[in-house]
């Protein structure tokens, strides 16, 4: 008999109720691990002077580690304590305490309002700037984020890397402050700041004491229209950017893999270009190119200003009008539709790079919103990604890594939101005795099994439970909520659609998951990249 114990209290985990409770705890534990990892890995999708959301991941990690410590304690006792049948009953006092805590958690999961954006208001200023204010009075801090709807996908051949280069130059002074003074002023106010560039947008943020918010808003508004771009600063910074490219891409295997993958998976859409830019384009970039990018895209009517934290909405609105509304609107170019041609056959690329192990990456063309209108398919693919690789006992982990032992690591990556077409990516490292051909065959076989047999109600319920838990964790982080607002708005979606998306995911059926596994996972839309390791030259 296996008992969950604390001091002198015992709870029988071999009883029917005990097994159910332990099963739910296990799901919860695995779900938190997966979602924490997924959330914190999001920073890898962005290019910037530093990676984003360290504070968010740190807070999330601390909270989840506390929960895992409690569950791990139970787990160890579950595995190690053996008792006689005479101990088959449990202490009623402990049961009451444990059950009470569990009921509270269940209540939160079941009845906590799905709306993440209570106390949130949206405004449009006279110059077209969209302002969103999120009041959250749990801590005496505030966050300001400015998102520009311009990323590397808005660049053209020969000018790649401009969005990221301007991100660097935004810290090099304005007509009112000297180079480096922006960061120095934020630090002097006791705050932290950074920026990041993606294929779809560029964003800047500061996190400061609520009492310093007005000063920080004035600083950010200043560089929206008074940036001082000069040749001397640019000539130094472009060398920094080129070195960053060498460090993160040219001399890093994973960087080479995904740069090569995107360059081949897309033939016409600008997603094929790296965010940091091709080295030849960086070598030929001029300060005039950066100035033109700034003049074209950095306008209040092409930006979203998000303020959150221990703030007063009316006060923030007044400050926004004072510092931002005076900035003139611009004629922002209308982005023309850029459709990726239909892929009509498998594409195979072999990359040779310095590495210890071979790698295999499968990338299937997939819908993303709002670029695609296939909303239900995108939702079902999000669920499928979790079924394959969304928790410790997901199919790839359980069957290919632990059971068949043909891979040491498998990851899936699919984001169903983006301004351009999506990719459903499966990346794997084979074991020493497994060929890449066999690994590819087995990965495809797992997806084919789902397309033919579907998934179980247990799998689907587990994933949906994780989605609800993820929403709860997200609401505990002010920075995380503001990040999500910015992401949705920069993609052309209203921030309130976060809850709509969650509800849609909760309504995905087993048949929908089976259907997308059959529809999207075929060789006609597949790009395969294999990595052949080469030894490091001494």
Task: Label each PLM-derived region with a short phrase.
Residues 263, 332-393:
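His/Glu-based metal-binding/catalytic segments typifying zinc-dependent metallopeptidases
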């Amino acid at each position: 008999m296996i008992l969950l114990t604390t001091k002198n209290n015992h709870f029988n985990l071999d009883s029917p109720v005990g097994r159910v409770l332990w099963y739910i705890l296990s799901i919860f534990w695995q779900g938190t691990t997966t979602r924490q990892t997924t959330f914190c890995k999001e920073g890898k999708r962005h290019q910037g002077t530093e990676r984003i959301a360290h504070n968010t991941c740190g807070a999330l990690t601390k909270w989840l580690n506390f929960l895992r410590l409690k569950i791990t304690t139970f787990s160890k006792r579950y595995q190690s304590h053996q008792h006689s049948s005479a101990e088959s009953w449990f202490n009623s006092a402990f049961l009451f305490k444990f059950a009470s805590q569990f009921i509270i958690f269940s209540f939160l999961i079941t009845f906590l309002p799905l709306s993440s954006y209570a106390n949130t208001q949206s405004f449009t200023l006279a110059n077209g700037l969209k302002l969103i204010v999120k009041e959250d009075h749990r801590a005496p801090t505030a966050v300001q984020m400015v998102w520009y709807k311009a990323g590397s996908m808005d660049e053209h051949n020969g000018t790649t890397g401009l969005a990221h280069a301007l991100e660097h130059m935004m810290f090099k002074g304005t007509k009112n402050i000297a180079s480096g003074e922006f960061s120095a002023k934020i630090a002097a106010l006791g705050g932290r700041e950074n920026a990041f560039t993606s294929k779809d947008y560029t964003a800047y943020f500061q996190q400061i004491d609520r009492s310093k918010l007005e000063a920080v808003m004035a600083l950010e508004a200043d560089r929206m229209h008074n940036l001082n771009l000069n040749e001397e600063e640019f000539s130094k910074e472009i060398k920094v950017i080129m070195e960053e490219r060498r460090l993160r891409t040219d001399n890093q295997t994973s960087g080479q893999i995904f740069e090569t993958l995107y360059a081949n998976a897309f033939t016409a859409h600008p997603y094929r270009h790296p965010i940091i830019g091709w080295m030849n384009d960086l070598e030929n970039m001029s300060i005039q190119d950066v100035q033109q990018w700034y003049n074209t895209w950095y306008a209040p009517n092409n930006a979203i200003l998000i303020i959150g934290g221990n703030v007063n909405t009316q006060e923030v609105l007044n400050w926004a009008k004072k510092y931002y509304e005076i900035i003139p609107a611009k004629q922002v170019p209308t982005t023309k539709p850029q459709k990726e041609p239909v892929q009509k056959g498998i594409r195979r690329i072999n990359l040779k790079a310095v590495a210890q192990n071979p790698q295999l990456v499968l990338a299937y063309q997939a819908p993303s919103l709002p670029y695609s209108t296939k909303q239900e398919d995108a939702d079902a693919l999000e669920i499928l990604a979790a079924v394959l690789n969304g928790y410790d006992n997901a199919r790839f982990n359980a069957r290919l890594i632990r059971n068949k032992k043909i891979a040491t690591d498998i990851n899936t990556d699919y984001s169903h939101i983006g301004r351009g077409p999506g990719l459903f990516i499966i990346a794997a490292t084979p074991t020493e005795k497994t060929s890449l051909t066999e690994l590819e065959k087995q990965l495809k076989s797992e997806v084919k099994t789902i397309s033919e047999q579907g998934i179980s109600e247990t799998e689907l319920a587990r994933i949906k439970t994780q989605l609800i838990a993820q929403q709860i964790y997200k609401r505990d982080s002010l920075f995380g909520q503001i990040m999500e607002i910015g992401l949705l708005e920069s993609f052309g979606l209203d921030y309130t659609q976060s809850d709509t998306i969650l509800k849609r995911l909760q309504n995905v059926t087993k048949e929908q998951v089976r259907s997308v596994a059959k529809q999207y996972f075929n060789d006609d839309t597949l790009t395969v990249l294999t990595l052949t390791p080469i030894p490091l030259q001494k």
